[in-house]
Swiss-Prot record:
Protein name: Transcriptional repressor NrdR
Record key words, sorted: ATP-binding, DNA-binding, Metal-binding, Nucleotide-binding, Repressor, Transcription, Transcription regulation, Zinc, Zinc-finger
Role, per record: Negatively regulates transcription of bacterial ribonucleotide reductase nrd genes and operons by binding to NrdR-boxes.
Gene that encodes the chain: nrdR
Cofactor binding mode and count: Binds 1 zinc ion.
Alphabetized PROSITE patterns for the sequence: ATP_CONE
Family as reported in the entry's similarity comment: Belongs to the NrdR family.
Amino acid sequence: MRCPKCGGNKSSVVDSRQAEDGNTIRRRRECEECQHRFTTYERVEERTLVVVKKDGTREQFSRDKIFNGIIRSAQKRPVSSDEIEEIVNRIEQKVRSQSDNEINSEYIGSLVMDELAELDEITYVRFASVYRSFKDVGELESLLKQITKGSKKKKDK
């Protein structure tokens, strides 16, 4: 492993442990030439996933795109970035567990909406308003009625 400080090619592993996500190994290394310590991460190489969008175009799966979409929807809401990261991890795990290398964007969107419905209703509505591209206020109103019914059922339990 090349040292980021001096560019030396020889380093030794000082410490090695499993990272928090359980899918990555974190290694502390020390350069044998300049004694600089640095961290590397090792993970299984994932298969490339392709997202098929509504218009038929294809693009590589991006967990950052999901994360950023949720962040925008959760702006000024009591939702932490750790909670969002956990949601994105669960969604990515579900998507990668599919046998197909191509995933419809609608499937990913529905996974996000399912997660947000459990997390925060306002964040859910904000995301849904963009994801579903409501044609008029009536469509949004029917979504709000569904959420209100769901909230009442949760409170009654």
